[in-house]
């Protein structure tokens, strides 16, 4: 989820490194059929007598006696324990707790720092703070588990999403998969703070570049063969958010656009300064006309803090003189956006989502009871995690628009608008979450796909 850069305030941040390379998931039914034994045949050991004259009578008596004496009881079917799942289903519904032993979730890709990298400080006190977090096994386990959920769900999305589907169905499919793999539907107060979506699933088509998700009251948008769709979603466990994005297209016309942005993201993970050069080395031919791929200038990568998708530091991927440092123990979302348009985004119509703001007036001072009630629901279910109106309706909230507007106007909620380039242009996005270590970076969200 990109951080928009204000035109009035230059971005803070600088680049920090990672690399390319790659997850997979398949599906097979869970459990096993219970076998049932049939009833035994009654009187199968009839009498056998040497007296031929009485053979028929004796035989009849023997059958009767046998049926009286040897009535076989029906055997109760043996209950077999369901086999532990070894593969992910499709759509993904097997919780990761059934596929992995806690503490043994896959690690990300490790990439050593370049010798020439000066972006990180070596101040002892800052390094000590970062190291304390890195040594916490629960912190690493939460992040790696969230990353594995992201990998498995996005693999399913890449295999199953096709033209003709609505964006609403695609978003619901991704989010249902995330919640199922986490084993938490998030419907009770407080559940959403334990684990869930890190922010609403972004599904941006063509010139729409960031921060669009289908919401109630909007007309269904159907994915077309000619569309270029950015898929950006986050997974959090105990407030530690994995933020990763990819772009899908079905028409090979746009292959170079996707390749340019993927290359730029991988270059930025290694050395931030190389992002712009990598992206601008590509061109895209659309309908007989050649377009240069331009980096989007007023949106940036960012650090991630506990329960906060945008932690305050920005990483522009164009040349700049900013000297903000990336520190050991910090988590960053390294993302790039490329476009055939102007390379500068504007606020589009509508609202993507909302985030609860700290500070501001007390909810008790709000003029509407509905706003006070809604503030309580948001705080209990999302905290500082970005949410959207679809999520409120999933919790059973009704007639909430006036309350939302009241919270926004009183500074208790921040609203995010969709961001777009000029109409008729096409844009792409790739993004990974990285963890900075003392001597290397761990690309937490790296998979076999990107």
Swiss-Prot record:
Compositional bias of kind Acidic residues: 47-56
Enzyme class of the recorded protein, top EC level: hydrolase
GO molecular function terms noted in the UniProt entry: initiator methionyl aminopeptidase activity; metal ion binding; metalloaminopeptidase activity
Positions with biased composition (Basic residues): 69-86
InterPro entries: Creatinase/aminopeptidase-like (IPR036005), Met_Aminopeptidase_Type2 (IPR050247), Pept_M24 (IPR000994), Pept_M24_MAP (IPR001714), Pept_M24A_MAP2 (IPR002468), Pept_M24A_MAP2_BS (IPR018349), WH-like_DNA-bd_sf (IPR036388), WH_DNA-bd_sf (IPR036390)
PANTHER family in alphabetical order: METHIONINE AMINOPEPTIDASE 2 (PTHR45777), METHIONINE AMINOPEPTIDASE 2-2 (PTHR45777:SF1)
Protein name: Methionine aminopeptidase 2-2
């Amino acid at each position: 989820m990109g951080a928009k850069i204000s035109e009035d305030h230059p971005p803070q941040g600088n680049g920090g490194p990672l690399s390319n390379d790659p997850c997979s998931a398949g599906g097979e039914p869970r459990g096993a059929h219970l076998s049932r034994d049939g009833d035994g045949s009654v009187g199968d050991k009839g009498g056998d007598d040497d007296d031929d004259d009485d053979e028929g009578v004796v035989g009849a008596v023997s059958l009767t006696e046998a049926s009286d004496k040897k009535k076989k009881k029906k055997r109760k079917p043996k209950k077999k324990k369901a086999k532990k799942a070894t593969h992910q289903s499709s759509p993904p519904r097997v919780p990761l707790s059934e596929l992995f032993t806690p503490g043994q979730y896959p690690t990300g890709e490790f990439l050593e720092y370049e010798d020439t990298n000066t972006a990180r400080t070596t101040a002892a006190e800052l390094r000590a703070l970062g190291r304390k977090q890195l040594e916490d096994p629960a912190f690493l386990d939460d992040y790696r588990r969230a990353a594995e959920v992201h990998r498995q769900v996005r693999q399913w999305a890449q295999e199953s999403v096709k033209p003709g589907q609505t964006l609403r169905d695609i978003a619901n499919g991704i989010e249902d998969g995330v919640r199922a793999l986490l084993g938490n539907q998030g419907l009770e107060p407080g559940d959403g703070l334990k684990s869930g979506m890190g922010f609403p699933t972004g599904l941006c088509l063509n010139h729409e570049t960031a921060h669009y998700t289908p919401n109630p009251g909007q007309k269904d948008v159907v994915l077309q063969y000619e569309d270029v769709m950015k898929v950006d979603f986050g997974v959090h466990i105990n407030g530690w958010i994995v933020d990763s994005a990819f772009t899908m297209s079905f028409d090979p016309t746009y292959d170079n656009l996707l390749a340019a942005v993927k290359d730029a993201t991988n270059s930025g993970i290694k050395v931030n300064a190389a992002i712009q050069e990598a992206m601008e080395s590509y061109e895209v031919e659309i309908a007989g006309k050649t377009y240069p791929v331009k980096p989007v200038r007023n949106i940036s990568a960012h650090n991630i803090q506990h329960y906060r998708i945008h932690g305050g530091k920005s990483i522009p991927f164009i040349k700049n003189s900013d000297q903000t440092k990336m520190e050991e123990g910090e988590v960053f979302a390294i993302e790039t956006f490329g476009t055939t348009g102007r390379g500068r985004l504007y606020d589009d119509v509508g609202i993507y989502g909302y985030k609860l703001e700290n500070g501001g007036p007390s909810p008790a001072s709000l003029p509407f009871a509905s706003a006070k009630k809604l503030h309580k629901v948001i705080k209990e279910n999302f905290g500082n995690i970005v949410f959207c109106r679809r999520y409120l309706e999933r919790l059973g909230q009704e007639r909430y628009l006036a309350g939302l507007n009241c919270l926004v106007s009183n500074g208790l909620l921040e609203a995010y608008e969709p961001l777009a380039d000029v109409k008729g242009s096409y844009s792409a996005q790739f993004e990974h979450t990285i963890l900075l270590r003392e001597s290397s970076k761990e690309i937490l969200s790296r998979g076999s796909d990107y």
